[in-house]
Curated annotation (Swiss-Prot):
Protein name: Large ribosomal subunit protein bL28
One Gene Ontology molecular-function label: structural constituent of ribosome
InterPro entries xrefs: Bacterial_rp_bL28, Ribosomal_bL28, Ribosomal_bL28/bL31-like_sf, Ribosomal_bL28_bact-type, Ribosomal_bL28_sf
Organism, as annotated: Bifidobacterium longum (strain NCC 2705)
Cellular component aspect of the GO annotation: ribonucleoprotein complex; ribosome
Name of the gene encoding the protein in the UniProt record: rpmB
A GO BP entry: translation
Family statement: Belongs to the bacterial ribosomal protein bL28 family.
């Protein structure tokens, strides 16, 4: 399953881990995705949404 937000499309980015001696090692920064039950067109579905979209109110959770 892809690490991509279903609302904004945010995905993994690459960067470096930098040690104290400034040696750099490649790494990936993955978005904080949560599995959320929401209503789309009157039907309950499960989406993987980043926390930034949840906090911004772009997705409304459904009571379990």
């Amino acid at each position: 399953m892809a690490a991509r937000c279903a609302v904004c499309g945010k995905g993994p980015q690459t960067g470096f881990t930098v040690s104290h001696s400034h040696r750099r090692t490649k790494r990936s920064f993955r978005p904080n995705l949560q599995s959320v039950r929401t209503t789309i067109d009157g039907e309950n579905t499960r989406l993987r949404v980043c926390v930034k979209c949840l906090k911004a109110g772009k997705v409304q959770r459904v009571a379990a």
